[in-house]
Amino acid sequence: HLRGVFSHDGDSYSAKDIETARRKSVIAQERTLKFAKMCRENGFDISIVGIGSTPSLANDSDILEGITEIRPRTYPFMDAFQDNAMNHTWNCNAFVLATVMSKPTEERVILDVGAKGLTMQSRSEGICAVEGLGNLIDYPDTHIDLMYDEHAIIYNKKFHDSVKVGDKVRIVPVHICPVVNLYDRMYLIDEKGDVEKELTIACRGKLQ
């Protein structure tokens, strides 16, 4: 039984500015509403018409009449993409904790997390453009430069001189959505850095 239709205006991620993202959102909504109308005209009782995505909806895009749900799904956590789209005014709430494993040169630092823990996603254009493959939240202007399966490399002398082998660092993923799906558990941390609760990732491995 078909109850509804939904769309995701993913091209808003590459919009050159906020106004363009808003226009893309309206176009996507109009297209989705048109498809819902076609379904109804062909005998389907469509009660749900849903839209995304976070870059446009979080920047106050208009919601057209007939839209019944919105899905800015990155909103609870945010990430480096959205941090840029929001002009660095929103807090990122999800981090990957990594360990400094090696400092083999005067500016190179190697961490114990790689593509299997952060993904290789990046974006070079648009409001969600980022530099590097993950931001180090506690070290301004520091990002991951290279990444392999199980380790990441940072070329930054200031960061190099600020950490020692064994230190823990918090990484803001470039795109949090696939990162959450890479882990079995996540931890809620209070303002002091203490673990308040361990959560199981309910949708882990549910893609098949």
List each model region and its residues.
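C-terminal accessory subdomain/extension
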Residues: 104-208
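Solvent-exposed alpha-helices and their adjacent loops that cap or buttress functional pockets
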Residues: 41-43, 62, 93, 102-103, ...
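Active-site loop ensemble at the mouth of alpha/beta enzyme cores that anchors a bound cofactor
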Residues: 21-24, 55-133
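Active-site loop/helix belt of alpha/beta enzymes
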Residues: 1-86
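Short, glycine- and charge-enriched coil/turn segments that flank and shape catalytic ligand pockets
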Residues: 16-19, 64, 86-89, 157-164, ...
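Generic structural signal for well-ordered, non-membrane alpha-helical segments
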Residues: 21, 25-32, 93, 147, ...
